[in-house]
């Protein structure tokens, strides 16, 4: 078990030097934009190591980790079973470019956990998974248009970047240069949680919509759960109009329950995308679904998809070890820890007198500085995001590493213990007071 993190955060000098060095060879100094701290200001922390619930940065500062590598680390960092599995796999060879028994076992685990999934294809990232699922939906239906929801992020796929969440929301970008007008023209962007808008889009585009893609529960505009009946309504509308429903469970899959969001709600998609937890923190992802749809993939069908490193044996080993270790006790701990975190957040922010909403999507958590619940991207953007930088940095100074963006979900691990929650509880009052005292003009953003 990790030792209680030290509240010794006087220096970020080593991280600052590394950031300057990185900026000379890596665009923006980071390999994914949100890591650059652009929306919160300050120096991004360069991590040297992690164990259990603890991150240690290049300056030796320790933090309770509430990012968990953006979701995958449900067991905590460097879990012995996962580390041992990776070590054994690596000694047997790093990559073969050929099938292995382990990749069959991982696919069997996924199929066994998520009932609507008959077949699975492994890929290397969530972006690949969503890109491939959309291509497959278009190939299966013979249609071109897709529906997505504002604030939902499905990776940096050209057709899915319009009004996306995650880093796109963090940086305030409507889309991205390089996405052509033709690609954008086939993407219909609608408000999340608005079934009337979806019904109207189908009526306005008869026989043209291949699929609706949605985060099964949104986590990339913050934690925003689907309103009761929303996913079921999507299921009904897609069936009525001959379109496919793609449930993006890259974030929720095998985190919010052993069967992902499907295990909580029971609404079946035609296609699913997975990542994060199923890879144990290594680069791997998957897409899967009904056999009649998945069998349109090459070599059985005409829809092409491939990958040199797909099914990488080391990543597969990490994923298998994680799923095997993720028993009922782990999921109970995740739910319990999320509820406890939410309670501490509510207590501190209420005491500080700042308007806020602590929201959950399963065991994913978010804080919105708002006087009303956040149900879609518009209400997320309408919150007082200028309070978040002060809140974030006070937590960081207190030894708590939260997501460096107001538009990202917070993630707990099963490794959090009494020491971890004591550190969180100690850091929160000052952070809440900092948020309450913040002004739009004084924001670091």
UniProtKB/Swiss-Prot annotation:
Keyword entries, A-Z: Cytoplasm, Isomerase, Porphyrin biosynthesis, Pyridoxal phosphate
Pfam families from the UniProt entry: Aminotran_3
CDD domains assigned: OAT_like
EC number: 5.4.3.8
Positions where N6-(pyridoxal phosphate)lysine occurs in the chain: 276
The keyword Cell wall biogenesis/degradation is annotated on this UniProt entry: no
Pathway linked to the protein: Porphyrin-containing compound metabolism; protoporphyrin-IX biosynthesis; 5-aminolevulinate from L-glutamyl-tRNA(Glu): step 2/2
Localization in the cell: Cytoplasm
Cellular component GO terms, alphabetical: cytoplasm
Catalytic activity: (S)-4-amino-5-oxopentanoate = 5-aminolevulinate
Gene3D superfamilies: Aspartate Aminotransferase, domain 1, Type I PLP-dependent aspartate aminotransferase-like (Major domain)
GO-annotated biological processes: protoporphyrinogen IX biosynthetic process
Record-linked PROSITE patterns: AA_TRANSFER_CLASS_3
NCBIfam families reported for this sequence: hemL, PRK00062.1
Subunit relationships: Homodimer.
Family label: Belongs to the class-III pyridoxal-phosphate-dependent aminotransferase family. HemL subfamily.
Name by which UniProt lists this protein: Glutamate-1-semialdehyde 2,1-aminomutase
Organism field: Nocardia farcinica (strain IFM 10152)
């Amino acid at each position: 078990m990790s030792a209680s993190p030290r509240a010794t955060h006087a220096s970020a000098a080593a991280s600052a030097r590394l950031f300057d060095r990185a900026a000379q060879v890596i665009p923006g100094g980071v390999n994914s934009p949100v890591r650059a701290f652009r929306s919160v200001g300050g120096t991004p922390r360069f991590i040297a190591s992690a164990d259990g619930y603890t991150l240690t940065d290049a300056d030796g500062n320790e933090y309770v980790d509430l990012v968990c590598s953006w979701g995958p680390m449900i067991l905590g960092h460097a879990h012995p079973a996962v580390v041992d599995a990776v070590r054994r796999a690596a000694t047997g060879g790093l990559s073969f470019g050929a099938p292995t028994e382990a990749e069959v076992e991982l696919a069997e685990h996924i199929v066994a956990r998520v009932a609507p999934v008959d077949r699975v294809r492994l890929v290397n990232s969530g972006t690949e998974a969503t890109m491939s699922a959309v291509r497959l939906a278009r190939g299966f239906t013979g249609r071109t248009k897709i529906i997505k929801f504002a604030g939902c992020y499905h990776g940096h796929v050209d057709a899915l970047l319009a009004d996306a969440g995650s880093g796109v929301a963090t940086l305030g970008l409507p889309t991205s240069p390089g996405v052509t007008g033709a690609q954008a023209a086939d993407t219909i962007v609608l408000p999340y949680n608005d079934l009337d808008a979806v019904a109207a889009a189908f009526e306005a585009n008869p026989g043209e919509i291949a699929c609706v893609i949605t985060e099964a529960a949104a986590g990339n505009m913050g934690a925003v759960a689907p309103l009761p009946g929303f996913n079921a309504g999507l299921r009904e509308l897609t069936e009525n109009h001959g379109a496919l429903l793609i449930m993006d469970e890259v974030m929720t899959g095998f985190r919010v329950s052993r069967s992902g969001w499907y295990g909580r709600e029971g609404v079946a998609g035609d296609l699913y995308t997975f990542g994060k937890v199923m890879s144990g923190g290594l680069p791997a992802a998957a897409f899967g679904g009904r056999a009649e749809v998945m069998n349109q993939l090459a070599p059985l069908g005409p829809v092409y998809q491939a990958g040199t490193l797909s099914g990488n044996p080391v990543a597969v080993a990490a994923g298998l070890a994680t799923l095997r270790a993720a028993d009922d006790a782990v999921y109970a701990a995740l739910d319990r820890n999320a509820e406890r975190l939410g309670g501490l957040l509510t207590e501190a922010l209420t005491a500080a007198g700042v308007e806020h909403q602590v929201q959950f999507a399963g065991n994913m958590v978010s804080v919105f500085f708002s006087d009303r619940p956040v149900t879609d991207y518009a209400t997320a953007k309408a919150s007082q995001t200028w309070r978040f930088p002060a809140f974030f940095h006070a937590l960081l100074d207190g030894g708590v590493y939260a997501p460096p963006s107001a538009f990202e979900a917070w993630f707990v691990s099963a490794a959090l213990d009494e020491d971890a929650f004591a550190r969180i509880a100690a850091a929160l009052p000052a952070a809440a007071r900092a948020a309450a005292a913040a002004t739009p003009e004084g924001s670091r953003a």
